[in-house]
Amino acid sequence: MNETLSSSKPRWGEPFRAPGAKFDTCRMFENDFLEKYSRIHPATPFVVYVPLVLFMLWRSWTRHELAIASMAGLFACGVLAWTVTEYCLHRWVFHWVNETSWGKRVHFMLHGVHHDFPNDKDRLVMPLLTSVPFAVIFWTLFRVTLGTTLAEPMFAGMALGYLCYDGTHYAVHHFKQTSRIGRFLKRHHMLHHHADHDGGFGVSSPLWDIVFRTMPSIKKLAATQAKPRQAD
């Protein structure tokens, strides 16, 4: 698994720092194409999905002639649906670990890389190779169950919820938070990273951590800091 790729390439999973970069990263894929598209500029999701959100809201208003109240309600349901999805993916998919070698590698590619290299700017937001299939799945689900007229504003809300997640995730890692809400979300997420991997699964909102009683514990941080460092 950790075979040398070539004399000019870093070994799979091993830290390296690109020229001019401030933070370490690692190579995730031996295939150059997959490696390239496992990285993404943090603005890319907004460039792709903001026009989609606006287009679907425009269609809901002009073509389907939905009332403002109906559009707003469906849009809000879509945002709420994203918060549930965000929590469930983070808790039960991203933090699922199979002890086999392939299971560990899949976990590393899905989420472990972010915990090992939390400040890698190119791997903080979801790559299109992941977000587009998710978008297709949820759009199909909404359209089949609700019909196109109701699915469009709900999907627009879910897409906006996803953008809030990606934007919040990038911001708490790379920007100083001055607002009360921003400081809370940053602390919430940093506790998940550094103290309590079994809590703090919501990134854009703590709602479902409160509901499922998985708020990250400051006591675990104190316990971690109190442990004597083991000799190498």
What are these regions (language model features)?
Residues 185-191:
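Short, membrane-exposed interhelical loops at transmembrane-helix boundaries
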Residues 177, 194-200:
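Short helix/loop segments within enzyme catalytic domains
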Residues 1-155, 198-232:
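Non-catalytic, topology-defining segments of multipass membrane proteins
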Residues 148-183:
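Alpha-helical transmembrane segments and their immediate juxtamembrane interface regions
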